[in-house]
């Protein structure tokens, strides 16, 4: 009898929890999509040439806000979305750990454009890491006209605020959660 009552109580509770969690995850991707679109609009306002990167890409990632801080050891974290064919296909989490001379904090947006299917597929496998040898282009008016895809990728950052001094080494890692 106890087992039957336990099952009758736990089963609906588990189903409700699962449905609530999936609704929460959907809301998260919708909210991130709105913020990503706002960041992309800002990027286009600073440099309209970004449209050429979007049109040449098989997919792109927009991380609207990356928070970065450091004092000897530093880190960064941000969440955004992966777009393929104009639609959100995954939530992307960026994490970074760095060691070296660094002090301060800053916030920025990050944009990754994938020129071809192999580079996008490599990113989507989830074991993708941007090391110290990969550089991002800081967005200023007209900068994307001089930027180019390197190894199938183009990466841009747009400062939102803060001040950080650094001479550090560390890589960015990305984790994807599909819809």
Predicted features along the sequence, with ranges:
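Positively charged n-region of N-terminal signal peptides that target proteins for export
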Residues: 1-4
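Bacterial N-terminal signal peptides
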Residues: 7-17
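Small-residue-enriched, tightly packed secondary-structure blocks
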Residues: 23-179
């Amino acid at each position: 009898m106890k087992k039957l009552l336990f099952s009758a109580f736990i089963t609906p509770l588990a189903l409700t929890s699962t449905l609530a969690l999936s609704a929460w995850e959907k809301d998260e991707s919708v909210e991130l999509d709105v913020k990503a679109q706002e960041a992309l609009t800002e990027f286009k306002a600073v440099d309209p040439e970004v449209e050429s990167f979007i049109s040449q890409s098989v997919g792109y990632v927009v991380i609207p806000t990356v928070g970065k801080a450091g004092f000897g050891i530093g880190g960064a974290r941000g969440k955004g979305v992966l777009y393929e064919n104009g639609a959100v296909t995954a939530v992307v989490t960026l994490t970074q750990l760095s060691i070296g001379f660094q002090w301060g904090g800053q916030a920025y947006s990050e944009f990754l454009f994938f020129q071809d299917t192999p580079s996008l597929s490599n990113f989507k496998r989830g074991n993708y890491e941007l090391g110290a040898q990969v550089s991002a282009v800081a967005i200023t008016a007209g900068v994307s006209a001089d930027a180019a895809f390197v190894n199938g990728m183009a990466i841009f950052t747009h400062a939102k605020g803060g001040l950080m001094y650094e001479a550090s080494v560390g890589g960015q890692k990305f984790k994807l959660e599909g819809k």
